[in-house]
């Protein structure tokens, strides 16, 4: 027996997920009217769709900027899609802005994904962990497993795609991208980003006030 689904519920699900009306109705019927289960069903189907699109070439897009802290921190990020049509859509531009804000909120993030992290960085992290005192009395096999777990955690701290989304901590940036791939129907990729901090790399002059006064008095 097919459960009766109201048009209002279908509309609410469509607004929540951006899926098509018929897809929303079908998901609600499959889940016996359970709204949250229907959301998860559509999300899973969307992620499958996103995975198929991820191999497609994305050469269009936008470069988005975000300035924070009264002009003391700036972010530039390049977000790519497949067509200029999608690049001009408000949803895509909002996504780019949110990603730029995410980068501003994550000062430890230096790479887009863990596979981008150079091997020398990984080896350095491994050496640091292997030499920690709390592992001195551990058997070699156990020690290596603990070190591997710590390294993976550290690498994720450096990776943008592994960060919890600042607007919804229940999802990662990787999941946010996949959801938007499903919503907009094109492959979307974060190609690169750059962080600018005011005065970074410059040595700030710190004058000794007493010395300055003495110099003035002796002139």
Swiss-Prot record:
Pfam families: EF_TS (PF00889)
Domain of life: Eukaryota
Keywords noted in UniProt: Chloroplast, Elongation factor, Plastid, Protein biosynthesis
UniProt cross-references to Gene3D superfamilies, sorted A to Z: 1.10.286.20, DNA helicase RuvA subunit, C-terminal domain, Elongation factor Ts, dimerisation domain
Molecular function as annotated in GO: translation elongation factor activity
Location relative to the cell: Plastid, Chloroplast
PROSITE patterns for the chain: EF_TS_1, EF_TS_2
Endpoints of the signal sequence: none
SUPFAM superfamilies xref list: Elongation factor Ts (EF-Ts), dimerisation domain (SSF54713), UBA-like (SSF46934)
Cysteine disulfide partners in this protein: none
One GO cellular component term: mitochondrion
Family under the similarity heading: Belongs to the EF-Ts family.
Role description: Associates with the EF-Tu.GDP complex and induces the exchange of GDP to GTP. It remains bound to the aminoacyl-tRNA.EF-Tu.GTP complex up to the GTP hydrolysis stage on the ribosome.
The protein's name in its UniProt record: Elongation factor Ts, chloroplastic
Organism encoding this protein: Guillardia theta (Cryptophyte)
Lineage, top ranks: Eukaryota, Cryptophyceae, Pyrenomonadales, Geminigeraceae, Guillardia
